[in-house]
Amino acid sequence: MKVNFIAPAELSRMAYPLLVKGEQPALMNIGSILGHRAVPWKSEYCASKFAIRGLTAALRSEWKSEGIDVLHLSPSTTDSQFFDQAIEDTMQRNWKGKRAMAPKRVAEIALDAWVNRRRDVLLTPGGKALVWLDRIAPRIASWAVTRWG
């Protein structure tokens, strides 16, 4: 929670006075698809990403009158050291290797979202499908994430 939520929340509040003075000011928070739909065995991580999504929505409302855009980026698995260090499960490491997005690609999409002021960006087709499924058929989404994580 300290890294995924508390730090971005405090940094956002600290940046506010500078953002108010800026031309076309914007703030981008990096969430996760797991901030839209929780999955088994990643409870704390999911909770922190739900929190950053909620913070982003609240700041967007609070800062709208100041002309500050508040953006939220939701990547799926990114090829980083997170899985290597945090998860010992061989299946998880294999899953990462097959489906992880390159950090450079995440950065490119983030930059495009910034330039075009896209407020909520889901990065992958699989992530979009999971969010969509959770909205229209939450029981099926629950079954799917329980089955395949």
How should these model regions be labeled?
Residues 39-43:
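Active-site loop immediately N-terminal to the catalytic Tyr-X3-Lys motif
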Residues 12, 48:
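Active-site helix of classical SDR
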Residues 32:
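Residue(s) in the substrate-gating loop at a strand-loop-helix junction
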Residues 62-125:
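SDR active-site lid
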Residues 118-149:
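A transmembrane-helix-recognition feature enriched in membrane-embedded lipid enzymes
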Residues 35-37:
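Conserved catalytic-site region of short-chain dehydrogenase/reductase
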Residues 16, 51, 56-64, 69:
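Catalytic Tyr-X3-Lys helix of short-chain dehydrogenase/reductase
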